[in-house]
């Protein structure tokens, strides 16, 4: 069960990471 939680958290980090960076770049570009 812990392995599944670790995999899902890792997947969230892998997906959310680039999204947050893209949002930051968009905000800087709009300014």
Curated annotation (Swiss-Prot):
Q: Which organism is it from?
A: Phacus acuminatus
As for membrane topology, the entry says: Single-pass membrane protein
Show the GO cellular component annotation of the record.
chloroplast thylakoid membrane; photosystem II
Task: Tell me how this protein assembles.
Answer: PSII is composed of 1 copy each of membrane proteins PsbA, PsbB, PsbC, PsbD, PsbE, PsbF, PsbH, PsbI, PsbJ, PsbK, PsbL, PsbM, PsbT, PsbX, PsbY, PsbZ, Psb30/Ycf12, peripheral proteins of the oxygen-evolving complex and a large number of cofactors. It forms dimeric complexes.
State the protein's name: Photosystem II reaction center protein Psb30
Signal peptide, first to last residue? none
InterPro entries xref list: PSII_Ycf12_core-subunit
Residues in coiled coil: none
Q: Which family does it belong to?
A: Belongs to the Psb30/Ycf12 family.
Q: Entry's Pfam families?
A: PSII_Ycf12
Q: Where in the cell is it found?
A: Plastid, Chloroplast thylakoid membrane
Report the transmembrane regions from the record.
Answer: 5-25
Protein function? A core subunit of photosystem II (PSII), probably helps stabilize the reaction center.
Keywords assigned by UniProt?
Answer: Chloroplast, Membrane, Photosynthesis, Photosystem II, Plastid, Thylakoid, Transmembrane, Transmembrane helix
Q: What is its main location?
A: plastid
Q: Which GO terms fall under biological process for this protein?
A: photosynthesis
Question: Taxonomically, which superkingdom?
Answer: Eukaryota
């Amino acid at each position: 069960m812990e392995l599944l939680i670790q995999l899902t958290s890792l997947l969230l980090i892998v997906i959310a990471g680039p999204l947050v960076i893209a949002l930051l770049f968009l905000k800087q570009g709009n300014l």
